[in-house]
UniProtKB/Swiss-Prot annotation:
This is UDP-N-acetylglucosamine transporter ROCK1. One of its GO terms (cellular component) is Golgi membrane. Keywords: Endoplasmic reticulum, Membrane, Sugar transport, Transmembrane, Transmembrane helix, Transport. GO terms for biological process: pollen exine formation; regulation of shoot apical meristem development; sialic acid transport; UDP-N-acetylgalactosamine transmembrane transport; UDP-N-acetylglucosamine transmembrane transport. Residues 35-42, 131-135, 193-203, 263-270 are lumenal. Belongs to the nucleotide-sugar transporter family. CMP-Sialate:CMP antiporter (TC 2.A.7.12) subfamily. The gene is ROCK1. SUPFAM superfamilies: Multidrug resistance efflux transporter EmrE (SSF103481). It comes from Arabidopsis thaliana.
Length: 325
């Protein structure tokens, strides 16, 4: 099934896409536990993030060499095409992350979690605007169930942060508005990535390379005035690192490549389903390895996630005009 502008509508998932989705769910779900066990507290965050981006670029280039797309890259690649397909989404994601950091300081975990999950709706909205991919009534219902499940999971795992000392104006301008803007930007960036891969036929591996380079450059510029930059100058780039630190760094890099593949083949909306499902995986792994039982929120969210995935998969939008023809 294709939309009017030539983009493929991911109404059904093939074996390859299902495999990518399962891998991403497991990786995203296991990442918090792996990071907690393998990264020491004195490791400078910027050093792990930059190393992750470098590993991501190396892995993507290896995969491109393996599938033969690296050979024709010199002839096909253009700066304008790269900036349009990858530069813009990378810049949007960087701004989104900054807005989330601002808002989290001014909102309690419940309000933050609820507002942050609206990105699923905005992804569906921008997918319709940019790619003309419509959702059926039941799919919209499935998105509502998914957001409910995401909020329950986020609240169950969230901290008991109290923002009672923050006045209403500060909460609005430094909390609510930034997180809503971040949700809009998240939906826009995800849809742009899907557009670049499905309409412009931009390789997901190439997008990973380009976005990692742009993101790394933005991060390097930010270190000029950030505490992490001062810490790197004082203690060195690999301060606090051990051999185990590479495990979560490599895992996170592979997860970034999987995000690109899932977005490219299944779409940004389905990526949202994968990310929420991964929260359940995290809860189960915490129970298995740390003895921490799933919260009541998690137990309530489990059937909601399963129902939403089933509904979204079984009842795609069908164009009545095309059906008659």
């Amino acid at each position: 099934m294709a939309t009017a502008n030539g983009a493929k509508s991911p109404s059904s998932m093939g074996p390859k896409v299902l495999f990518y989705s399962i891998l991403l769910t497991l990786q995203y779900g296991a990442q918090p536990l792996i990071s907690k066990r393998c990264i020491r507290k004195d490791v400078i965050v910027t050093s792990s993030v930059l190393t992750c981006e470098i590993v991501k670029v190396i892995c993507a280039l290896i995969l491109m060499a393996r599938n033969g797309s690296l050979k024709g890259l010199a002839k096909e690649w253009t700066l304008m095409g790269s900036l349009t397909a990858s530069g813009l989404p990378a810049a949007i994601y960087a701004l989104q992350n900054s807005l989330l950091q601002i808002s989290y300081r001014s909102l309690d975990s419940l309000t933050f979690s609820i507002l942050n999950q609206t990105k699923i709706f905005f992804t569906a909205f921008f997918t319709f605007i940019i790619l003309r991919q419509k959702q059926s009534i039941l799919q919209i219902g499935a998105l509502c169930l998914l957001i409910m499940a995401a909020v329950l999971l986020s609240v169950g795992e969230g901290s008991n942060k109290d923002s009672s000392g923050i006045n209403a104006d500060q909460k609005l301008f430094y909390g609510i508005i930034p997180v809503l803007a971040a949700s809009v930007l998240s939906g826009l960036a995800s849809s742009l990535c899907q557009w670049a891969s499905q309409v412009k036929k931009h390789s997901s591996y190439l997008m990973t390379v380009e976005m990692s380079i742009v993101g790394s450059l933005c991060l390097l510029v930010s270190t000029l005035k950030s505490p992490d930059g001062e810490a790197i100058k004082k203690y060195g780039f690999f301060h606090g690192w051990t051999a185990l630190t590479l495990v979560p760094v490599i895992s996170n890099a592979l997860g970034g490549i999987l995000v690109g593949l899932v977005t490219s083949h299944a779409g940004g909306v389905r990526k949202g389903f994968v990310i929420v499902s991964a929260l359940l995986v995290t809860a189960l792994l915490q129970f298995a390895f740390e003895g921490k039982p799933p919260s009541s929120y998690c137990l309530v969210a489990l059937p909601l996630v399963m129902s939403s995935i089933s509904m979204y998969q079984k009842y795609p939008y069908i164009d009545k005009k095309k059906k008659k023809v």
